[in-house]
């Protein structure tokens, strides 16, 4: 069995990597990938904590987090496809300009 500290450290490293990708990247697709990494890191923390205390709640939360991440990814990718068709660019700077 993996110790609690090792699992939580791995989850924290993954969360920081996802946050770094979210903050540094200017492409919306890479920002979405960074957000998915952050969601998976938090789900990993739930699983590690649940297995440490012998409770199935962590696995239930993991299933919930994965289903929410799948819904978020599908909606995000659909919006990105529409944005790419209209602007031919996924740069966050070009998207932030409003018409009107």
From Swiss-Prot:
Principal localisation: membrane
Q: Which keywords does this Swiss-Prot/TrEMBL entry list?
A: Cell inner membrane, Cell membrane, Membrane, NAD, Quinone, Translocase, Transmembrane, Transmembrane helix, Transport, Ubiquinone
Decide whether keyword Transmembrane helix is in the record: yes
- Could you give one GO CC term from the UniProt record? NADH dehydrogenase complex
Among the GO molecular function terms of this UniProt record, one is: quinone binding
User: What reaction is this protein's catalytic activity?
Assistant: a quinone + NADH + 5 H(+)(in) = a quinol + NAD(+) + 4 H(+)(out)
Query: Carries keyword Thylakoid?
Result: no
Membrane-spanning ranges: 4-24, 28-48, 60-80
GO BP terms in the entry: ATP synthesis coupled electron transport
Location in the cell? Cell inner membrane
Write down the Pfam families for this protein, in alphabetical order.
Oxidored_q2 (PF00420)
Family per UniProt? Belongs to the complex I subunit 4L family.
Q: What is its biological role?
A: NDH-1 shuttles electrons from NADH, via FMN and iron-sulfur (Fe-S) centers, to quinones in the respiratory chain. The immediate electron acceptor for the enzyme in this species is believed to be ubiquinone. Couples the redox reaction to proton translocation (for every two electrons transferred, four hydrogen ions are translocated across the cytoplasmic membrane), and thus conserves the redox energy in a proton gradient.
Report quaternary structure and partners. Answer: NDH-1 is composed of 13 different subunits. Subunits NuoA, H, J, K, L, M, N constitute the membrane sector of the complex.
Specify the protein name: NADH-quinone oxidoreductase subunit K
């Amino acid at each position: 069995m993996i110790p609690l500290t090792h699992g939580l450290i791995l989850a924290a490293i993954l969360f920081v990597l996802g946050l770094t990708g979210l903050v540094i990247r200017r492409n919306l697709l890479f920002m979405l990938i960074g957000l998915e990494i952050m969601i998976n890191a938090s789900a990993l923390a739930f699983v590690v904590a649940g297995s440490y205390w012998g409770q199935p709640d962590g696995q239930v939360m993991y299933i919930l987090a994965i289903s929410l991440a799948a819904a978020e990814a599908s909606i995000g990718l659909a919006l990105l496809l529409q944005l790419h068709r209209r602007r031919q660019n996924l740069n966050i700077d070009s998207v932030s300009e409003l018409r009107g």
